[in-house]
Amino acid sequence: KVVVLLGTNMDIPVVDRRGRINMERVRLVHGNGGRFSHELTERFILKYFTNDLLAPLHDGAQFPVTAGRMAFSTDSYVVQPAFFPGGNIGKLAVCGTVNDLAMNGAVPQYLSCGLILEEGLAFEELDEILRTMAEMATAANIQIVTGDTKVVKKGEVDKIYINTAGIGMIPDGIDIGPHRVKAGMDIILSGAIGDHSIAVMGQRFGLDLSDSLKTDCAPLNKMVHAVLDKVGSQVALLRDPTRGGLGTVLKEIADQSQVGIKVEETAIPVHDEVQSVCDILGYDPLYLANEGKVVLVVEPAVTDQVLQVLHGFEEGKEAVLIGKTLDKNIGKVGLQTAIGGVRLVDLLGEDQVPRIC
């Protein structure tokens, strides 16, 4: 036999005598909807994603809807590298959408998972990503109930991209949004900023960073709802400072709620390892992405109670009061610096660290 390869993107699967494909790496044939697509689903996806709503493998999930309000959110994840200290793209994909639902005051219930896989992706890596997604879904008490998988030619994506969309129910009495924010409220931050960006950047560029520096990526829904259960009606706004970081979120709050904001630079926690990298490379921690932090705008009367609840969770043990909303300087954020000056915080024109989520 003579085999002629007509180009580098030819999909030449390795098949054994029983007709089973070589399962070490993803091939284009895994995305054609045929037998190998089914084998991929059965051997890897259903290995970790199993529940009654997903089991029928229908074109979508069918689930009961209770009375009340729903929150719906979606996000796509293209982080490079796909694996980084403390997590991977799968952890990010579940926690990111779970946290977006939580920022709406919703209890996360259902999640979709769309996978775009690069030809040649090692199945060992895919397996680890899916396993992590299942672990995070369990931790957040959310079910992955529907999904889709596509395979594209090598070089068209970077290993794996993931889209997740989530649905959650908003409890009665909870009203979270920019419309609730008014002057005189307290601004609380649940912990130190910048860990995620620096952990990803360190992995990407091979920096010699401390082993203790890991992504802060975590599902925040249980912590958030512990706060809402305690003082829900007194919480005006919840935001997670992901892309663009704390500085961007504060500026957006000022613009959307038409208030001024003043925050204390010395009150904002930044871990020493993160600050050191920022000092060396010229990064501003205010604009570094976080994947396990929440900004809360609350009535001053409940600030101490909120901090007490947050301190009871690992994700909130470093929570602090960082500032207040004002009835002047509308749409502006003033950062009271350590040396006594005031610096205006605005939106960045360009990313400091690209592709961190």
Regions found by a protein language model. Give the residues of each.
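Helix-biased detector of long, well-ordered alpha-helical tracts
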Residues: G7-C357
